Amino acid sequence: MRSVPEDFTTLISDLETFLTDVLKGENLSKKAKEKKDAFIKRIKDVKTSYAQEFKDRRDEEFPEPDEADTNDGGSLHSEQTDRDDENAYDGVQQSPPVAAQDLQAVLKSGYLEKRRKDHSFFGNEWQKRWCALNNSIFYYYGSEKDKQQKGEFNIVGYTVKMNNTLRKDAKRDCCFEVSAPDKRVYQFCAASEKEAKEWVEHIDFLIKDLGGIIPEDEEEYDDCLSMSQSEVAILPDDDIYEELPEEDVPQPSKPKVTLVNKPPPPATPVTAAVNKSTDYANYFQGLWDCIGDQPDELSFKRGDTIYILSKEYDMFGWWVGEMKGVIGIVPKEYLLELYVL
């Protein structure tokens, strides 16, 4: 029997993958489904006739054409390959299996499209994954109900940035990548550009925090200096306006240092009725340096962890917080949630 060219067997295998996997979740018309089933049957017959030439990865175990799609876009084989790629590339044993719902202190989570390192012509290049940033580990699952991760990597030593060259469709501005020298590059696509930038911001902040290189305030945050410092800077210029043409014109009053909407000083510190070690919703971190102007104001630096005891003065824009045993009021605009629950 004449041998079948390798290019032909590869084409047939890719076509089989396209019909059984890629079109599996598509909403096809009745006529299109009949055509698809007919092609699958013909491919099966051809591969049976040339069993020696075809190395059938599925061992002729074809799924039923109308089988319900229980996957998120990729076949079971491709999902296993996704995990195998991790081991083969990094050369280290993976972390112990952990269920998505068992993760604690998650900084950021949600669905992303993850780009596969290797994919066939008809295979899915992007796979929907539920991702979670937990301490220094980036986990990805098939869904938020999975009992075991499909893969994970430690973000220490990596850098993260937006990348609009990964796709050419409407989501080209929604992509970002996490990379490091001599390590695998992980590429993701979010549902929107805003969501992608939030992921980049959280990952970048955590990488710098773990490396102890959170930058000091830059020029773009100059407007966050305390009002007292700003006032001192303009005091020398006030002399220019002291000479007025008429004596009966009143001198302009200087702006007050304290905020107009500042609440009254808090009474006896409120004691938390919950366990602080597990009350993740009330843990925040400083976005910028904040120097308190009054004794009842809490001073903190960017990246400092603050536990919020009370939001009694939320309408004024202030909360009652505690940091290192010191209690005081803090402006809520200067804070960012430490954990995403």
Swiss-Prot record:
It is found in: Cytoplasm. Gene3D superfamilies: 6.10.250.220, Pleckstrin-homology domain (PH domain)/Phosphotyrosine-binding domain (PTB), SH3 Domains. The keyword ATP-binding does not apply. GO terms for cellular component: cytoplasm; plasma membrane. Residues 61-70 have a biased composition (Acidic residues). The keyword Aminoacyl-tRNA synthetase does not apply. Residues 54-95, 246-265 are annotated as: Disordered. Residues 105-208 form the PH domain. Phosphorylated on tyrosines. It comes from the Eukaryota. Keywords: B-cell activation, Cytoplasm, Phosphoprotein, SH3 domain. Pfam families: PH (PF00169), SH3_1 (PF00018). GO terms for biological process: B cell activation. Residues 279-340 form the SH3 domain. InterPro entries: PH-like_dom_sf, PH_domain, SH3-like_dom_sf, SH3_domain, SKAP_fam. PANTHER family: SRC KINASE-ASSOCIATED PHOSPHOPROTEIN 2, SRC-ASSOCIATED ADAPTOR PROTEIN. Belongs to the SKAP family. May be involved in B-cell and macrophage adhesion processes. May play a role in src signaling pathway. This is Src kinase-associated phosphoprotein 2. It comes from Danio rerio.
